[in-house]
């Protein structure tokens, strides 16, 4: 078994939506080059089998998304794609016949003005992606309930797929629900992006650096996909080898602090997402 269950790779930090729960990007806006992504794949190929092409940004905005997936295949890397779905219809031809495209997570939002947004997503999934695992991601309030806008999305899913009463009940009572062949609903509470401005600090365990690690578009290696501004840099994969980074002092000091449930990083202490694991 390889060291990491997954590696997040940010191929762009540019997004075409401005959702209220998503923190703004305070870094230079850019797209990764094919040379740089090829370098990253070569560096990480012995450390994971699965890559997620996002930290921040909408991956389908990348003009070479098809070439990136094809490059990953040369390194036997399986690709999990997370998208807001608004560009699926426009870019679907670039995703077809990609045997290493393992899973597509579609984060369903009410915060866009695109007409027939959900209808387009349903159409693309039903006509082109039935052989792929597709997950409709829904966000709930902290009490696990849907707000009015999310409830409308749920009702459209129920009506489109003509879901049975049992499946509908599961949507409200469970977090991961199989609603059709290779099609799932995954729901989770909206979370607060970690920030040094957060007032609350806490100790606790985290899976960062044990099962996952992330690489920002500028090459900065960070503990997880929630360090969206690179506040906990462990190194830069364009300047040093991935091997040296994961065997380095910064990496191992932080990893041990997670194991001891006393994060050495201020950002990690102020991250509330780790409370899910404690």
Q: Predicted segments — roles?
A:
Residues 1-104, 112-119, 278:
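Conserved alpha-helical substructure of the radical SAM core
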Residues 15, 19-22, 206, 224-225, ...:
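Short cysteine clusters
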Residues 45-46, 92-114, 151-179:
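Structural recognition of alpha->loop->beta junctions
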Residues 106, 111, 125-159:
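Conserved strand-turn element in the central/C-terminal portion of the radical SAM core barrel
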Residues 128-138, 156-201, 226-276:
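C-terminal accessory region of radical SAM enzymes
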Residues 209-211:
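Short loop/turn microsegments at loop-to-beta-strand junctions
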Residues 215-216:
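Short, acidic, Ser/Thr-enriched surface-loop or helix-capping motifs
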